[in-house]
């Protein structure tokens, strides 16, 4: 690379996508700077998204587990905790993650610059530092990895102390007895689980006709049933007409004529790319209505020397995928092409209580494609390990081709689902005939384990063949 620039590459954002790109670039010998607008590295994933929400979920699920354990079932021993106490646990995890990720940059001699960046021209950025000074820096190439933020419609007053988004909910200082969650996507469903697990009444407003419609329908139905059974009120096919903040809570008027009142509102309906402050018009780049950029298979934007990864390019909007996208973009940026690519079947983990995880095709997709598939199921309640630890709620479902025995999709509902799914994913990725459901029958599992669900499900499915 020419050395007339301050840097070979500048990465805007230090979340998973920015970290993947920066580490990939420095490992290839590039001079790299990472710009982070906040005081700590890690991006939204570490500070407002994945890490704190999963830490909250874990704490709440352990409380539920304790209170449902027959050994501690008398009411004098019930474990309770305030939202503030649980947030302290999340803060501890965030601090550990921040220190660890800061160490990655320091060990790899990757410069971190703090402040807000915007483009002056195609190779120059202005950096507004926290002390008010403005610096300019130049680079041959750029990676935009500035992430996303919760979508704020203009007619919702997010300055009201009882109206929250998925970022500000982590600053909740009172103890709500009743919460309305608007938006039943992944974030809305995860927080519905968290609040209900703390004995808070939950109204979950879904703008569609079923929860998480991208999931296999059995998984979606399982979550709906579990919510219903735990007391979450789900209202499908509803949209708000007006949201009023009052002294003691929030009133939501729905277009159907209904009215709801609760102590607070969590608005969790969509996200927007953090591109509006980058002055992309100065370099001729345009975003869509949600602030997202279009890229090619190597994550190049319409400007070949400007790349974009992570939430800012939309689907799949997963921290795991963003890191890989950054790594692939770094390879393309230095070498002109990328030999690595995102895997075709990206696993999804949804951290409701219980968890949901999937990889591959759903039953609905295979039916529409007219693929002759069969189903193998294992119920957690039939596994010795689940009985020992009290994880009786859950199921593992394997979809496989009737003739070739190739695994086409795996879907899991239950505690540790996001871990369990990777066993099946590893077999699905095997080439040359290695992807076969018969593997689970012909191998030996530790006993007792949750992994044994694969053997049970495989036998169940193969026994259906004739």
UniProtKB/Swiss-Prot annotation:
Conversion of NADPH, generated by peripheral catabolic pathways, to NADH, which can enter the respiratory chain for energy generation. FAD binds at residues 36-45. This is Soluble pyridine nucleotide transhydrogenase. Keywords: Cytoplasm, FAD, Flavoprotein, NAD, NADP, Oxidoreductase. Belongs to the class-I pyridine nucleotide-disulfide oxidoreductase family. Its main location: cytoplasm. NCBIfam families: PRK05249.1. The gene is sthA. GO terms for molecular function: dihydrolipoyl dehydrogenase (NADH) activity; flavin adenine dinucleotide binding; NAD(P)+ transhydrogenase (Si-specific) activity. It catalyses: NAD(+) + NADPH = NADH + NADP(+). Gene3D superfamilies: 3.30.390.30, FAD/NAD(P)-binding domain. InterPro entries: Class-I_Pyr_Nuc-Dis_Oxidored, FAD/NAD-bd_sf, FAD/NAD-binding_dom, FAD/NAD-linked_Rdtase_dimer_sf, Pyr_nuc-diS_OxRdtase, Pyr_nucl-diS_OxRdtase_dimer, STH_gammaproteobact. Its EC number is 1.6.1.1. It is found in: Cytoplasm. Binds 1 FAD per subunit.
């Amino acid at each position: 690379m020419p050395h007339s620039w301050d840097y070979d590459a500048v990465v805007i954002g230090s979340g998973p996508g920015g970290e993947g790109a920066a580490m990939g670039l420095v490992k290839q010998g590039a001079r790299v700077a990472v710009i982070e607008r906040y005081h700590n590295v890690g991006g939204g994933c570490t500070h407002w998204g994945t890490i704190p929400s999963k830490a909250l979920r874990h704490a709440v699920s352990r409380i539920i587990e304790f209170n449902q354990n027959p050994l501690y079932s008398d009411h004098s021993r019930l474990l309770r905790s305030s939202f503030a106490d649980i947030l302290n646990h999340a803060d501890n995890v965030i601090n550990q993650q921040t220190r660890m990720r800061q160490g990655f940059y320091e060990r790899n001699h990757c410069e971190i610059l703090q402040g807000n960046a915007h483009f002056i021209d195609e190779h120059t950025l202005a950096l507004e530092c926290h002390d008010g000074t403005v610096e300019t820096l130049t680079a041959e190439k750029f990676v935009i990895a500035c992430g996303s933020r919760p979508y704020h419609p203009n007619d919702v007053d997010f300055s009201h102390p009882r109206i929250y988004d998925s970022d500000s909910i982590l600053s909740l200082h009172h103890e709500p007895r009743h919460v309305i969650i608007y938006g039943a996507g992944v974030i809305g469903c995860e927080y519905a689980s968290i609040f209900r697990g703390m004995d808070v009444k939950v109204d979950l407003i879904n703008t569609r006709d079923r929860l998480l419609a991208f999931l296999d329908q059995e998984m979606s139905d399982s979550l709906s049933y579990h919510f219903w059974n735990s007391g979450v009120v789900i209202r499908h096919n509803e949209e708000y007409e007006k949201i009023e903040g009052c002294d003691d809570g929030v009133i939501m008027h729905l277009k159907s004529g209904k009215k709801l009142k609760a102590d607070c509102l969590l608005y969790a309906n969509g996200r927007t790319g953090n591109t509006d402050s980058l002055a992309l018009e100065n370099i001729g780049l345009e975003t869509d209505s949600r602030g997202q950029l279009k890229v090619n298979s190597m994550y190049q934007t319409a400007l070949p020397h400007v790349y974009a990864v992570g939430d800012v390019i939309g689907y799949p909007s997963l921290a795991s995928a963003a890191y890989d996208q950054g790594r692939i973009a770094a390879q393309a940026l230095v070498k002109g092409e990328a030999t690595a690519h995102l895997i075709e079947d990206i696993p999804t983990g949804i951290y409701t209580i219980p968890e949901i995880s999937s990889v591959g095709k759903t039953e609905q997709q295979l039916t529409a494609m007219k693929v002759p598939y069969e189903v193998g199921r294992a119920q957690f309640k039939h596994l010795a390990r689940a009985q020992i630890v009290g994880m009786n709620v859950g199921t593992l479902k394997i979809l496989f081709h009737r003739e070739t025995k190739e695994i086409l999709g795996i879907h899991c509902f239950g505690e540790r689902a996001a871990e369990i799914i990777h066993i099946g994913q590893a077999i699905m990725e095997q080439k040359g005939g290695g992807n076969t459901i018969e593997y689970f029958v012909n191998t030996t599992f530790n006993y007792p384990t949750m992994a044994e669900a694969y053997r049970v499900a495989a036998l169940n499915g193969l026994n259906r063949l004739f």
